[in-house]
């Protein structure tokens, strides 16, 4: 999302739905591997990377930390932690047989940065928006560019008043 526009549509995702979607992603990726390591783009990629790594039997999990959002506002990209030298070596220096996992590709800005680090890696996301979709190799669900996905780790349970009491 741009820094000046709030999303037009909301797409809340429950833990159950997210787990199902991650398993579906794993099923698709099972035909693509084998992978020597999984690289999670943090923080959003941590949960799907853990599920995918478990399903594919991958033991080596690394992270790359690129900050691009502050709550709903997009900010300048900052690499806070790069991929370890050991993981890069496992991928032959170019990312071959490495699997990069994130929750979502939005504009593709984060994916471009990581692709620059390991260009031959396989990129997988659970959700993809049209602007970022060309940068990923495998995804499960496409959502429109004007949709904000509310992931389960970003939500809290709250009381919802009955409709008869004026709830919208």
Swiss-Prot record:
Cofactor(s) this protein cannot do without: Mg(2+)
Binding site for Mg(2+): 103
GO annotations of cellular component type: plasma membrane
Gene Ontology terms, MF aspect: guanine phosphoribosyltransferase activity; hypoxanthine phosphoribosyltransferase activity; magnesium ion binding; xanthine phosphoribosyltransferase activity
Residues where GMP binds: 106-110, 148-149
Topological category with respect to the lipid bilayer: Peripheral membrane protein
Binding site for xanthine: 106, 149
Cell compartment(s), UniProt: Cell inner membrane
Amino acids binding guanine: 106, 149
SUPFAM superfamilies registered for this protein in UniProt: PRTase-like (SSF53271)
GO biological process, one term: purine ribonucleoside salvage
EC number per UniProt: 2.4.2.-, 2.4.2.22
Reaction(s) this enzyme catalyzes, per UniProt: GMP + diphosphate = guanine + 5-phospho-alpha-D-ribose 1-diphosphate; XMP + diphosphate = xanthine + 5-phospho-alpha-D-ribose 1-diphosphate; IMP + diphosphate = hypoxanthine + 5-phospho-alpha-D-ribose 1-diphosphate
Binding site for 5-phospho-alpha-D-ribose 1-diphosphate: 43-44, 102-110
Keywords: Cell inner membrane, Cell membrane, Glycosyltransferase, Magnesium, Membrane, Metal-binding, Purine salvage, Transferase
Pathways involved: Purine metabolism; GMP biosynthesis via salvage pathway; GMP from guanine: step 1/1; Purine metabolism; XMP biosynthesis via salvage pathway; XMP from xanthine: step 1/1
NCBIfam families membership: PRK09177.1 (NF006613)
Family assignment from sequence similarity: Belongs to the purine/pyrimidine phosphoribosyltransferase family. XGPT subfamily.
Subunit structure: Homotetramer.
Described purpose of this protein according to its UniProt entry: Purine salvage pathway enzyme that catalyzes the transfer of the ribosyl-5-phosphate group from 5-phospho-alpha-D-ribose 1-diphosphate (PRPP) to the N9 position of the 6-oxopurines guanine and xanthine to form the corresponding ribonucleotides GMP (guanosine 5'-monophosphate) and XMP (xanthosine 5'-monophosphate), with the release of PPi. To a lesser extent, also acts on hypoxanthine.
Name of the protein: Xanthine-guanine phosphoribosyltransferase
Lineage, top ranks: Bacteria, Pseudomonadati, Pseudomonadota, Alphaproteobacteria, Hyphomicrobiales
Gene symbol of the encoding locus: gpt
């Amino acid at each position: 999302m741009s820094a000046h526009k709030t999303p037009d549509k909301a797409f809340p995702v429950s833990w159950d739905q997210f787990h199902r979607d991650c398993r579906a992603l794993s099923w698709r990726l099972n035909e693509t591997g084998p992978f020597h390591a999984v690289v999670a783009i943090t923080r959003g990629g941590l949960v799907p990377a853990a599920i995918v790594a478990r399903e594919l039997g991958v033991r080596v999990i690394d992270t790359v930390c690129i900050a691009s959002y502050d709550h709903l506002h997009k900010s300048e990209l900052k690499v806070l932690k790069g991929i370890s030298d050991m993981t890069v070596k496992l991928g032959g220096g170019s990312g071959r047989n490495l699997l990069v996992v994130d929750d979502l590709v939005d504009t593709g800005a984060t994916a471009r940065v990581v692709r620059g680090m390991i260009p031959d890696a396989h990129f997988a996301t659970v959700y993809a928006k049209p602007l970022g979709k060309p940068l990923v190799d495998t995804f499960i669900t496409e959502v429109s560019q004007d949709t904000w996905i509310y992931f389960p780790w970003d939500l809290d349970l709250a009381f919802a008043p009955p409709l008869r009491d004026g709830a919208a």
